[in-house]
Amino acid sequence: MRNPLVAGIARAIASVGLYALRFNFRGVGLSAGEWTGGLAEVDDLDLAIADARALAGGLPLALSGFSFGAVTTLRWLAQGGRADAVALAGVPLRSATFQPEQLPPVPDGTFIVAAELDQFGTAAELRAAYPRARIVALTGVDHFFGEKRNEVGVLIAEQIAQDLRLD
């Protein structure tokens, strides 16, 4: 997993005293399998969560995802998955070809860090689409958050800690 934003989120989560697991979906990097555009990747997430739960015993589960990982997290939740906290970044309303994404519902209260200038769905568009989500907008950045990548990790880690009552 070489995405600097995802790596920063994992570091920030670990910095508040939580375990952080990040992984490549099938067909990405050195992972086996073939990418399916989000269909079978929900199974990858389910297996990663099962492994994390096995390692962590009864500790609470918090999920975070960026872009494709955020959509996959939402799909997993829509299929009945449960987490104690959910904090996402860069939730795309449009695909890489700028076609509308068919997103599953965003559970009420989901925390989302959005980019004001996100080419796949601005903060304003996300607020209109998901009025019951807790959305924090970072100004002056696009989908990849540029120089505000570290801020994304801090916001997510702090929110997860608060949601899990760790602060």
Regions flagged by a language model, labelled:
Residues Q119-E125:
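Conserved alpha/beta-hydrolase "acid-adjacent" motif
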Residues P105-P107, F111-A114, D118:
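Short beta-strand/loop motif that positions the catalytic acidic residue
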Residues E147-D167:
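Catalytic active-site module of serine/aspartate enzymes centered on a nucleophile-bearing elbow/loop
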Residues L5, E34-L55:
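Alpha/beta-hydrolase active-site loop
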Residues M1-N24:
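Short, surface-exposed "cap/lid" segments of acyl-processing enzymes
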